[in-house]
Design a protein with these regions (language model features):
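Acidic/His-enriched low-complexity segments
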Residues: 1-313, 339, 344, 416-422, ...
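Hydrophobic alpha-helical and helix-loop surface patches within well-folded domains
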Residues: 44, 245, 278-535, 665, ...
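Short amphipathic alpha-helical surface patches that mediate protein-protein
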Residues: 61, 472-476, 493, 505-509, ...
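Hydrophobic/aromatic beta-strand segments within beta-rich folds
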Residues: 119-121, 363-365, 818, 868
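Long, ordered, helix-rich scaffold segments
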Residues: 415, 445, 551, 555, ...
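Basic, alpha-helical nucleic-acid-contacting "clamp/cap" segments
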Residues: 541
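Short, solvent-exposed S/T- and G/P-enriched segments that are highly enriched in secreted/extracellular
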Residues: 556-570
Length: 948
């Protein structure tokens, strides 16, 4: 395509025209730690991709930095040197074209296709402080900027900037400073001009300059980037140090990173001479051992699976205190938020699994994403969907099977994908990205979890051998290149000789998923598909069919299909008399739900319960999970409860954990059971309390209250010399932790709770780390059992410390402990408000709405607590420096912010839960508004409509 063929009016606004390709970046970065400024001297070497290009467009967000200078140079073949052909300064830079966002436009003349060009630039910008805990510096992630930035800037100005350089090492704030650059998905344009799209792969040469006084003050200061360090040398009369790093392989610019901070380090070199380094905070190097083990084993697995060795000489794992993502897969230098990488003494098996999964996920990106990269962000699922599946395949290859990672997959990935796909906000896996501002929105559960689930379905449909051969072909043909979803499916076509392209396009290009209904009659098994969203969509569906004697894979290619009993060695009478069954989605291998008829469904449940060491009907807990999830999706509460009663006692961790979620749904969904009014009937508080008590009794009856089993758990509350051997086998602790939830939170077992109370705060260090969340919840809920005011005060202080340092720091609370808030109702107002402020400052999750609402009811402080919420929201998200803006204006101006939307939805949801009394709602809003005099009178009516 020639330059003149490009139509500026038709091109997608997010993308720049592909008339040049950046071959190499040479970046020299200087960071002034005292003045919080940075300077970049850079050059980009380009080749032309079109005949006679008339312009050059490059990504840049110039509002974030000052362009000191910029030159366009052309390589003079005769002189064998570069020659400046155009020079631009800030005041003369052309304005970007209106229809291409965040870019600079340069007109060009007399450039031919084989000409080499070079862009030279110097930019200078300010570094923004984001987090006082560990003090992260990240000047290109605007998403997490808040009042914290201004507060920190003041601290920096008042306490540091004027300090003598020779005393800098005495300052703990600078010692804990971490400078990090996270580029994914398109943040690097906020630092310097570049080609900020994944389709542009380049080699990166990086140099870093730091002041000598900074380096001398902190001997353990580490400067880590994608490339291996070549040398460190003094410059500018020994006042600075220059770090020079090895060139990277070809990579997209979103993988560029560097980190500067004070770290300890552990390292090893594997059998393929790959250096593996794990960085940790000072004096915590043991916390990196788990991550090191995951990377060492993971590299072996991916080598074998892809048949391509890791293609670089090193891989670093670096924790940073503050980041929007859990981790980012930068080539050669993976960065993690602290909790996703560091495994300390007081962390649980759940946190161990989170760290293990995150390490294996990010490592898989060295192949899926970094070596083979999507052309554009609409195919981000090629990175994230595959990585989400492969983290589990990887772990399952070397971890103890007692860890039950596939159980976690069913709960956390598969079921959450179906649930996300059933929301009105769902979208295709492969989705258009029309604007750079939309890119972050597609890093969601559809790209990750649904993408993973449909690939898992293909894995089981083809079998591991064909699947592996197809993936190997895809990787080999496209290494160091960019690809699309279509290229992937064509590789599968070539290997399998099947039309995988047509089959899988339906799954990735349309939203929703099928619901299969089963009708068993004397002649055959009839299966019909309908779309969850009630549309006319149809899918080609791999059916994973099984009965007690046989399993078979059948491709359903129409709306309706009949299966003959003979094909399954099945007899109709066996189903009628309850001795056999038919399952259509065996072990939940397919991405769809199945609605069974009553007789067959009962057979599956009954035969599952009859299984033992001597009798096996080939029914797994995953099959039972599928039946429960279908009932939950349909909100068939009475049917759901009846099945749960048949399953009792529930001894499976997966099923008991899911039942815990069902219990919380029963409370939050205002569901109807056995002819009663709404479970959360707000008109009759007494009736509601009676109903909740009855629900609690139903769910408490699902566990086995075996005194010996309970005694065994009690003996593991605190670890000591007597029981430390019992603690070595932690694989049952996940089940036991959920069991304790039923016993002590749903069941209010006071005798067990009393054994949780500590004699001394030091006991907290010896608390069973796998029980710690549920034990703390039980202590919160039953603090009124303490016998004296001194004990109550003692535990109040303990809870404040726990909330501040542990409670919300783990993302596990988002998934497992939303309703833990209910257990604060006996705590003081100070403890409650501390938790509320913690959640508003660190956690974005509207699921807390129900928990807050119950807190209102139990605590009888609706107005005060709601106003505390509003005030906390106001402090964290409305103030901007010294300027205070209208709450309503802030909502209007930031309506596209996902983070803000979650906060706003939570506030609105709280009012919905308060009750049906409109006057009470108005009273709450008016009292809230009174705290914010800046809200104009004319805005109040609209504000009321927003919240009512």
């Amino acid at each position: 395509m020639s330059g003149d063929d490009f139509d500026m009016e038709e091109e997608i606004k997010a993308r720049i025209p592909k008339n040049f390709n950046p071959q190499k970046y040479n970046i020299k970065f200087y960071f002034d730690v005292l003045n919080l400024i940075y300077n970049v001297n850079g050059e980009i070497i380009l080749t032309s991709l079109t005949d006679n290009p008339q312009y050059l467009i490059i990504n840049a967000l110039t509002s974030k930095y000052e362009i000191k200078s910029m030159n366009i140079l052309k390589f003079d073949k005769i002189m064998d040197d570069w020659k400046v052909i155009q020079t631009y300064y800030l005041e003369s830079l052309p304005n970007p074209k209106d229809n291409i966002e965040e870019c600079i436009y340069f007109p060009l003349e007399n450039i031919i296709v084989d000409d080499l060009l070079k862009i030279e630039f110097e930019v200078e910008g300010e570094v923004e402080l984001l987090n006082l805990t560990g003090l992260a510096v990240n000047f290109n992630e605007p998403k997490i900027q808040s009042l914290k930035k201004n507060k920190l800037s003041n601290i920096w100005e008042n306490k540091i900037k004027d300090w003598p350089k020779e005393t800098i090492k005495e300052n703990p704030i600078i010692e804990s400073l971490v400078l990090s650059v996270v580029s994914e998905p398109n943040f690097i344009r906020l630092i310097f001009p570049c080609f900020d799209e994944p389709c542009y792969k380049s080699v990166f040469s990086f140099q870093l300059i730091l002041d000598k006084y900074y380096m001398d003050a902190f001997p353990k200061l580490k400067c880590i980037t994608n490339g291996s360090l070549i040398k460190v040398e003094p410059i500018e009369n020994n006042s600075k140090y220059l770090f020079t790093y090895k060139d990277t392989p070809l990579m997209s610019i979103y993988l560029f990173t560097f980190v500067v901070g004070n770290y300890d380090m552990i390292e090893t070199v594997n059998e393929n001479n790959i250096k593996i380094r794990v960085f940790t905070p000072l004096k915590n190097h043991h916390d990196g051992a788990l991550a090191m083990n995951m990377i060492q084993n993971g590299i072996k697995f991916y080598h074998n699976f892809f048949n391509i060795k890791y293609y670089y000489d090193k891989i670093d794992l670096v924790p940073i205190p503050d980041m929007s993502f859990r981790a980012v897969e930068n080539l050669g230098c993976i960065v993690f938020i602290n909790y996703a990488m560091l495994f300390g003494h007081f962390q649980s098996i759940l946190e161990k699994k989170l760290i293990s999964r995150t390490c294996c996920h990010e490592l898989s990106h060295m192949w899926f994403g970094n070596l083979v990269t999507m052309e554009w962000w609409n195919d981000i699922w090629l990175n994230e969907g595959f990585a989400r599946l492969f983290e589990y395949l990887c772990l399952n290859s070397f971890e103890n099977e007692k860890m039950k990672y596939w159980d976690n997959y069913i709960e956390l990935i598969y079921e959450s994908a179906l649930t996300s796909d059933e929301r009105i906000s769902t979208h295709p896996i492969n989705v258009e990205v029309p604007s750079a501002r939309n890119i972050e929105e597609i890093f969601d559960n559809i790209s990750y979890a649904k993408g993973s689930s449909v690939i898992r379905m293909l894995y089981y449909y083809l079998g591991e051998d064909l699947f592996k051969k197809s993936i190997r072909l895809y990787m080999e043909e496209n290494k160091f290149k960019n690809t699309t979803t279509e290229i992937l499916w064509k590789c599968f076509n070539n290997v399998t000789q099947l039309d995988i392209l047509t089959l899988m396009n339906e799954w990735v290009n349309i939203p929703s998923h099928p619901i299969l209904s089963i009708d068993i009659n004397k002649n055959n098994i009839n299966i019909k598909q309908t779309a969850y969203n009630k549309s006319d969509l149809l899918w080609k569906i791999p059916l994973f069919v099984k009965c007690s004697k046989k399993e078979k894979i059948i491709l359903m290619e129409s709306k309706e299909i009949n299966i003959d009993f003979k094909d399954l060695n099945l007899i109709y009478d066996d189903i009628e008399n309850g001795t056999d069954y038919i399952i259509i989605n065996s072990d939940l291998k397919g991405f769809y739900r199945v609605d069974y008829d009553g007789k067959n469904e009962n057979n599956i449940i009954d035969l599952y319960k009859k299984q033992n060491d001597k009798v096996n009907y080939n029914i797994s807990e995953y099959d039972i999970f599928g039946i429960l999830s279908m009932k939950l999706m349909k909100e068939d509460w009475s049917g759901l409860i009846e099945i749960l009663k048949k399953l009792k006692p529930i001894n499976s961790y997966l099923l008991l954990k899911y039942t815990k979620g069902i219990y919380q749904n029963v409370l939050t969904k205002k569901c109807y059971l056995e002819g009663y009014e709404s479970v959360l009937d707000e008109i009759n508080q007494k009736k509601e309390e009676e109903k909740v008590k009855e629900i609690n009794n139903i769910f408490l009856g699902l566990i086995d209250n075996d005194p010996d089993f309970i005694k065994k758990i009690e003996n593991k509350f605190y670890i000591n010399e007597e029981n430390k051997d019992m603690y070595k086998d932690q694989y049952n602790d996940e089940y036991e932790s959920v069991f304790l939830y039923f016993l002590c939170i749903i069941g209010d077992n006071v005798d067990v709770v009393k054994k949780m109370f500590m004699n001394d705060l030091k006991d907290f260090e010896f608390m069973n780390k796998n029980y710690k969340y549920i034990m703390i919840e039980a202590i919160m809920k039953n603090i009124n059992l303490l016998e004296s005011d001194v004990q109550v005060q003692y535990y109040e202080e303990f809870l404040k410390d726990y909330i501040s340092n542990y409670y919300v720091n783990s993302t596990l609370i988002k998934r497992d402990n939303q309703n833990a808030l209910l257990n604060f109702d006996n705590c003081s107002k100070e403890v409650i408000e501390l938790l509320i402020n913690k959640i508003f400052s660190e956690v974005n999750d509207i699921r807390y709405g129900f928990s807050f609402s119950q807190l209102f009811k139990r605590n009888k402080s609706k107005l005060n607590i709601f106003c505390s919420l509003m005030e906390g929201f106001h402090k964290n998200y409305i103030n901007s420096g010294d300027k205070t803006i209208s709450f309503l204006t802030y909502l209007k101006n930031n309506r596209n912010s996902i983070e803000l939307a979650n906060k706003f939805m939570l506030l609105r949801k709280l009012l919905l839960y308060v009750g049906n009394d409109k006057n009470l709602k108005i009273q709450i809003i008016e009292k809230s508004i009174s705290k914010f005099p800046e809200i104009k009178q004319e805005d109040k009516e609209e504000l009321f409509s927003l919240f009512l």
